Regions:
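Iron-associated oxidoreductase/ferritin-like identity signal
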Residues: 1-98
Length: 98
């Protein structure tokens, strides 16, 4: 692979890793904010999303290392809306996945 292509690939993979790490924080936060009698399955689903985001970040980081790059320590944007009703949380989760 050409050096320029490697640099582009590493940059993109680092962006993916940063985005996925923000998902870990976001979904973990959401799982702690859900309340009410129906919370258990929703909390489990949110924790599962956090685990999946961490796995994706790890894969992207491994590819960065494999290409001779340096995995980023940054994290993607985290916006706190202060809305913690389940509908708001699910809408924000959907928006994050787009």
């Amino acid at each position: 692979m050409k050096d320029l292509d490697k640099k582009k690939a590493v940059k993109l993979l680092n962006e993916i890793m940063e985005f996925e790490l923000s998902g870990v924080v976001r979904y973990t936060h959401y799982s702690l904010m859900v309340f009410g009698y129906n919370r258990i399955p929703i909390v489990s689903w949110l924790k599962g999303n956090a685990d999946e985001s961490l796995a994706h970040a790890h894969k992207a980081g491994e590819l960065v290392t494999m290409l001779g790059g340096h995995p980023s320590l940054k994290i993607g944007a985290l916006l706190e809306t202060e809305k913690h009703h389940i509908g708001d949380i699910l809408r924000e989760s959907l928006e994050h996945e787009k």
